[in-house]
A protein has these predicted regions:
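Intrinsically disordered, low-complexity regulatory segments in eukaryotic proteins
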Residues: 229-252, 394-399
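Conserved, function-critical positions that sit in or immediately flank catalytic
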Residues: 113-204, 236
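Short beta-strand micro-motifs enriched in acidic
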Residues: 152-156, 248-250, 626
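Structured, hydrophobic secondary-structure cores that serve as assembly/anchoring elements
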Residues: 1-105, 116, 209, 250-258, ...
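A short, polar beta-strand/turn micro-motif
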Residues: 106, 114-116, 241-243
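Extended Gly/Ser/Thr-rich low-complexity repeat segments
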Residues: 71, 75, 130-134, 173-184, ...
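Extended, Lys/Arg-enriched charged tracts that mediate electrostatic binding to polyanionic substrates
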Residues: 213-237
């Protein structure tokens, strides 16, 4: 079709702009660290703590002690303080593969096997005479693992004639069908050639070793261990963090069955069902195909160890299950009808039997460290990990096209530890490049000092990072134990509470918005002099006040230069403004560089900034996008320039109250 007009006329053209593009994962906060189970190096969005527990687990045993990772404590506190969405990335050490399901076996069943064939050529030690009849039953055809058979020719290595081999790779064959092979197709080794007729007769396939295979999407601390079901239904090595599978309700009339995912430590008579997928089949053409219903996709971290890792997704069907995927279907049933469209009467070869089993054959260790937890975290071991285990996750979350969040933390990494400082510097650099989040980090191990905290802070310079001190004692929500945690474990919850009750540009500090109600005590009760030293040194003190409890009492960033951006609330204000205005600007790319386009921008940005001003985020603002900064030269370079001037609202951090005592009868000043 012509795309231009030569003579006068009308040319109607199509421009499809209805494509649906994938959106980045949106979360309020991002937490990176070890968990009991879950996908490793796969950022996962959760919206409640219950959902977090289902995906990542809670407590675990190490020796005779019970522990909870800081990641879990931080997630609990975040949701308790009003957080609504959390992006969790599990990190691990060691190498491993996911666990697969134990054998999912099926029944014997009626299939279309090779029946009798007649020909005047027959292989028998090179002698070919007369007419011979032979039969090959379905049970001996090929590997005996499917109901579909093809007939192929293979050249004999020691004879001049060909032979017929039956394989299980064909399709469309049904009982009673005939296949005619023209005369001469077998070669010339004596005897007159006549047509070879093969009739497909009924045959029984042997029981399949594995109808289909499930694979876990996540690995437990010791991973999903296989084990037999005992008399009470207990799974050996089973735990609440492992899972098992069960096949129920096999229907030989419909060719369907149901898949149940159960908790690993449940009992046959007291099942703890996590998920159920009903009436699935092995028919890849059907909407209830088991892989389509449960999902068969898996994500693999590519480019590990580089500055630009990414996730590669393989598989055809998105995962509806949170715990497993269909790794492979070994016995597919294309349809349940013969070539005449008549329904068959037996489906037992198409479905597994009622049974249950476990997951096993996982290889490797999730945790290879000695396991220093809570206040024992050190340079060489942080919860079974070392600093380098975090790098891939940090670099993966640097991609703002895929992941959005406004605060990020990795509780357990302490900047004073040399092996922790390197990945934390990577994280700071990544967030500065993103420009849309703030990092909450820890400076000192447990039992640090005020001077040590300020000395460590002096080596950092970024308005996208903030540090808090000292450590805090909290009650582990899952084990009930009192444990010591670094401040970054709790601060995302403070930010969540601040945003729930106020706005992002309000200071997440002070009695009203900085209270740490779930904290039992701070590692150290800071004096006024301690707080002064810390705040002068860019460290936000966590103070203890009688009757008020433990309170975040500072909101500085780690920026060295004294400016508005050395405060957390101003940095977060800029993040909010840039995020909204950038989205407005995205819609202008490739639009005409005219006054109309500029007015479109102004008509959206000015009202937004007015609303921020009304909500106490700005004292004043001005937006310029006109001919003064979009000259002819700028336009000729295909540029559109806007200038946004803002006066951020400052917080009242230093309040001076002068009490003046006057003599009796004195006049008060105007």
């Amino acid at each position: 079709m012509a795309e231009t007009l030569i003579s006068p006329g009308v040319l109607a053209r199509e421009n499809d702009q209805s494509q649906i593009t994938s959106q980045p994962v949106q979360a309020g906060a991002a937490i990176i660290g070890p968990t009991v189970k879950g996908k490793v190096n796969i950022p996962t969005l959760v919206t409640t703590y219950s959902e977090y527990l289902a995906n990542f687990g809670s407590t675990f045993d190490s020796g005779s002690d019970e522990f909870t990772f800081l990641t879990s404590i931080s997630a609990y506190n975040y949701f308790q303080n009003g957080g609504t969405s959390l992006l969790v990335t599990r990190v691990a050490s060691g190498s491993f593969t996911a666990a697969s399901s134990s054998k999912v076996s099926g029944n014997d069943g009626l299939v279309a096997g090779a029946g009798t064939f007649t020909t005047n050529s027959f292989e028998a030690d090179g002698a070919v005479t007369g007419s011979t009849v032979t039969e090959v039953t379905g049970s001996s055809n090929g590997s005996g693992t499917g109901a579909e058979f093809a007939f192929v020719f293979e050249a004999a290595s020691t004879s001049s004639f060909d032979s017929i081999t039956v394989t299980s790779t064909g399709s469309g064959y049904a009982v009673g069908d005939t296949i005619t092979i023209p005369s001469g197709s077998l070669g010339a080794t004596g005897g007159a050639g006549t047509d070879l007729i093969i009739t497909l007769a009924a045959g029984n396939i042997q029981q399949s070793n594995n109808i289909f295979t499930l694979e876990t999407l996540a690995e437990g601390t010791i991973m999903n261990s296989t084990g037999p079901e005992g008399a009470t239904g207990a799974l050996d090595s089973g735990s609440a963090n492992n899972i098992r599978w069960e096949i129920v309700n096999p229907n030989t009339d419909q060719g369907t069955f149901s898949v149940v995912i159960r908790q690993g430590n449940d009992r046959t008579k007291s099942k703890s069902v996590l998920e159920t997928f009903t009436n699935v089949s092995l028919d890849p053409k059907a909407s209830n195909y088991v892989a389509r219903v449960i999902g068969d996709q898996t994500q693999t971290l590519m480019g590990a160890g580089t500055a630009n890792p990414y996730l590669q997704t393989t598989g055809s069907y998105p995962n509806a299950s949170r715990f497993v995927r269909v790794k492979q279907v070994n016995v597919k049933t294309p349809d349940y009808f013969d070539n005449s469209g008549v329904a068959k009467t037996a489906y037992t070869a198409s479905i597994p039997t009622a049974q249950s089993g476990t997951f096993g054959d996982a290889v490797g260790n999730i945790l290879t460290g000695t396991g220093n937890y809570y206040d024992n975290i050190s340079n060489s071991d942080s919860q079974g990990l070392v600093g380098g285990n975090y790098t891939d996750a940090f670099n993966l979350l640097a991609n703002k096209d895929d992941y959005r969040y406004n605060v990020i933390t990795a509780p357990g990494l302490i900047y004073e530890n040399a092996t922790h400082a390197t990945p934390l510097n990577t994280l700071v650099s990544n967030i500065e490049n993103r420009g849309d989040a703030i990092i909450v980090m820890d400076l000192k191990n447990y039992a640090g000092t005020v001077a040590g905290a300020t000395t460590t802070a002096a080596s950092l310079d970024s308005s996208y990072a903030a540090a808090y001190w000292p450590w805090l004692q909290v009650t582990d929500p899952d084990s009930g134990q009192l444990v010591w945690v670094p401040a970054s474990t709790m601060i995302p919850g403070v930010y969540a509470n601040n945003d729930r009750t106020s706005e992002a540009w309000f200071a997440p500090a002070g009695i009203n918005r900085g209270g740490l109600g779930s904290v039992r005590q701070a590692e150290r009760k800071l004096t006024q002099a301690n707080r002064d030293t810390l705040y002068t040194g860019k460290v936000n003190p966590i103070a203890t006040f009688p009757g008020r409890g433990v309170v975040v009492f500072g909101q500085k960033t780690l920026q060295n230069q004294a400016s508005a951006l050395d405060r957390v609330n101003v940095r977060r204000l800029l993040i909010e403004l840039k995020s909204y205005i950038s989205q407005v600007s995205d819609n202008l790319v490739f639009e005409q560089n005219t006054a109309a386009t500029r007015n479109t921008f102004l008509s959206q940005v000015n009202p937004y900034l007015e609303s921020v001003q009304q909500r106490q985020g700005l004292y004043a603002f001005k937006v310029v996008m006109d001919s003064s900064n979009n000259t002819a030269d700028v336009i000729d370079r295909n540029q559109l320039v806007g200038a946004i001037y803002i006066q951020p609202t400052k917080t009242a951090e230093f309040i001076y109250l002068d009490f003046n005592i006057l003599p009796t009868g004195a006049t008060f000043p105007a």
